[in-house]
Amino acid sequence: MAIMSDKWIKEAVINQSMIRPFAEKQVRVHNKEKIISYGLSSYGYDARVSNEFKIFTNINSTTVDPKNFSEYNLVDREVDVCIIPPNSFALGRTIEYFKIPRDVLVICVGKSTYARCGIIVNVTPLEPEWEGHVTLEFSNTTPLPAKIYANEGACQFLFLKSDQICDTSYADRQGKYMKQVGVTLPLT
C-alpha cells in the first residue's frame, strides 16, 4: 500500500466524487479571522467538523453499553463552539461526505492544534467502498472544559491505495454504517 498525494486526491475527487464539498487548498483564514485549517494537504485531506454535536452527560445516570446504546447518554447541540466537559467525550461529524474507492483504505489522525490542547480525535478506518459523513469522536483528556470549533479543521484523512482490489468491500458486505448522515450512534 502506498500513501496517496494531493495530485491523486484531486483526481479522485474529480473522477469519483470522493470528497464533497472539497477544498482544493489549505484554508487558514475565514472572514479575516484565523481558523483551524482544513482542505487538501500534501498527502491527505483535513476535514471540518459540522455544528452538530452529541455530548456525553451524566444527568440521566445511564450506563454506556456499546451493544445497547441509549440516546439518554448524550445531549444534542447545534453550536458554533462545542464545549466538552473535563475528562469527557463528544461526537461530531464531518461536513464532508466521503465516497471511498474499492482499492483504497483511509485512516484518520488528529490535528496537532487539538492534540496539543489535550483533545484527541478518533475515527476508525474508512473501508473500501464505504461512503457517508464520518462520525468523529472527540475526547477531552484535560481537567478543564475544552472547545471544538464547528466549520473548522478537526482531523486529517490519509489515503492508502492497495496494489490489489479487495475481494469483499464494505458495500459488498452491507456494512451497518454505510451511507450514514449526521452523527451516527453505535449500532450492533
Swiss-Prot record:
EC number(s) given by UniProt: 3.5.4.13
Positions of the catalytic residues: 137
InterPro entries: dCTP_deaminase (IPR011962), dUTPase-like_sf (IPR036157), dUTPase_trimeric (IPR033704)
Pathway participation: Pyrimidine metabolism; dUMP biosynthesis; dUMP from dCTP (dUTP route): step 1/2
Molecular function GO labels: dCTP deaminase activity; nucleotide binding
Enzyme class, first EC level, given as a word: hydrolase
Catalytic activity line of the entry: dCTP + H2O + H(+) = dUTP + NH4(+)
Keywords, comma-separated and alphabetical: Hydrolase, Nucleotide metabolism, Nucleotide-binding
Database matches in Pfam families: DCD (PF22769)
One of the GO biological process terms: dUTP biosynthetic process
Annotated binding of dCTP, by residue: 111-116, 135-137, 156, 170, 179-180
UniProt function note: Catalyzes the deamination of dCTP to dUTP.
Similarity comment text for this entry: Belongs to the dCTP deaminase family.
Subunit field text: Homotrimer.
Record NCBIfam families: dCTP_deam
Name the UniProt record assigns to this protein: dCTP deaminase
Organism name: Rickettsia felis (strain ATCC VR-1525 / URRWXCal2) (Rickettsia azadi)
